[in-house]
């Protein structure tokens, strides 16, 4: 099914790849996004959906010194977020605080809370502990996981532990398990690795080539969703990982990211380099799948795609559900176009 141009758009000044839901903002539907300009001063935009839901407003515009490759908002403080950035061939990661007061009339300077300077190689991402009130975070480069404790009042971050994934694996990203704060999934060229943060050791893995992105289902404890380089999407039951419990066709080119809805367990979003955002209906349960009749199972496999949003002219890399209004999501294409959409017409009946 092809979607129309019903989304609310906002244009960034430069190219961009990352957008994050501001989970700690309980009063507004808000998103943070950052630009990726090689020659110009980069920007972080704080965007809020108007109370009537008809406009996407820039509530804050902040200068950022480097190209932003990853951005994640703190789950416990709406003014704090992390970025991974590059300057030429070198990479860095830092925690930032939005100054008060702020506005869009001119570009304000962000306050650096802490530098995550325990890396020597290319840094890929920063993950915040999903508990919402924790000061713990993880940063990953291609070879290492670093576990941090953040003290924003003292403007410092302390390394609690650091571990190498081994020379055979090149880490590319990951997701923190919302059901078990001691567990993190890390993606690599050849597998999904599961790490126990208490011991900083791998305790399990899914051997699957070229996994690009993963996300946990917030409503189903054992379900993980992965996006693969060959364009497909797979749902895994972590209690039995030999085969996926469901496969979705993904995108016509690379599937770049997948996100499970924070409230509706059957809904999954994906974005890709085919300039599309796809909304999927997935059972997300091996028990559910095996209990279906052959006709029901066949119908679900044939048409799991609820809608395809095609308001884009470039590859779509950024994707975030709103945690405050879980029927709303934001997507970001490489040309700097942010689009807000509602999936209300596709919500499952309860």
Curated annotation (Swiss-Prot):
The keyword Cell wall biogenesis/degradation does not apply. Keywords: Abscisic acid signaling pathway, Nucleus, Repeat, Ubl conjugation pathway, WD repeat. The keyword Nucleus applies. Pathway: Protein modification; protein ubiquitination. GO terms for cellular component: Cul4-RING E3 ubiquitin ligase complex; nucleus. This is WD repeat-containing protein DWA2. It is found in: Nucleus.
């Amino acid at each position: 099914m092809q979607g129309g141009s019903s989304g609310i758009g906002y244009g960034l000044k430069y190219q961009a790849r990352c957008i994050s839901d501001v989970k700690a903002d309980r009063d507004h539907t808000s998103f943070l996004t950052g630009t990726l300009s090689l020659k110009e001063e980069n920007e972080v935009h704080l965007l809020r959906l108007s109370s009537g839901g008809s406009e996407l407003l820039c509530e804050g515009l902040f200068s950022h010194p480097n190209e932003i490759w990853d951005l994640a908002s703190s789950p416990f403080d709406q003014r704090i977020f992390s970025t991974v950035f590059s300057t030429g061939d070198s990479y860095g990661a830092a925690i930032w605080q939005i100054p008060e007061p702020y506005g869009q009339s001119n570009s304000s300077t962000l306050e650096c809370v802490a530098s995550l300077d325990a890396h020597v190689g290319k840094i890929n991402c920063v993950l915040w502990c999903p508990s919402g009130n924790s000061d713990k975070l993880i940063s990953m480069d291609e070879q290492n996981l670093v576990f941090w404790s953040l003290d924003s009042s003292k403007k410092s971050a302390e390394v609690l532990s650091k571990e190498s994934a081994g020379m055979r694996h090149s880490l590319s990203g990951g997701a923190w398990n919302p059901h078990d704060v001691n567990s993190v999934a890390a993606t690599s060229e050849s597998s999904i690795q599961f790490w126990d943060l208490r011991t900083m050791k791998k305790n399990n893995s899914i051997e699957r080539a070229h996994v690009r992105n993963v996300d946990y289902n917030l409503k189903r404890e054992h379900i993980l969703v992965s996006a693969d380089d060959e364009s497909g999407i797979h749902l895994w039951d972590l209690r039995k990982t030999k085969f996926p419990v469901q496969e979705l066709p993904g995108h016509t080119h690379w599937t770049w990211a997948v996100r499970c809805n924070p409230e509706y367990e059957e809904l999954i979003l994906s974005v890709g380099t085919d300039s599309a955002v796809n909304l999927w209906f997935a059972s997300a349960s091996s028990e559910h799948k095996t209990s279906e009749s052959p006709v029901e199972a066949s119908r679900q496999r044939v048409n799991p795609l609820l809608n395809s949003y095609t308001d884009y002219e470039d590859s779509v890399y950024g994707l975030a559900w709103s945690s405050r209004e879980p029927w709303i999501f934001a997507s970001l294409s490489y040309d700097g176009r942010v689009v807000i959409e509602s999936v209300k017409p596709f919500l499952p009946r309860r």
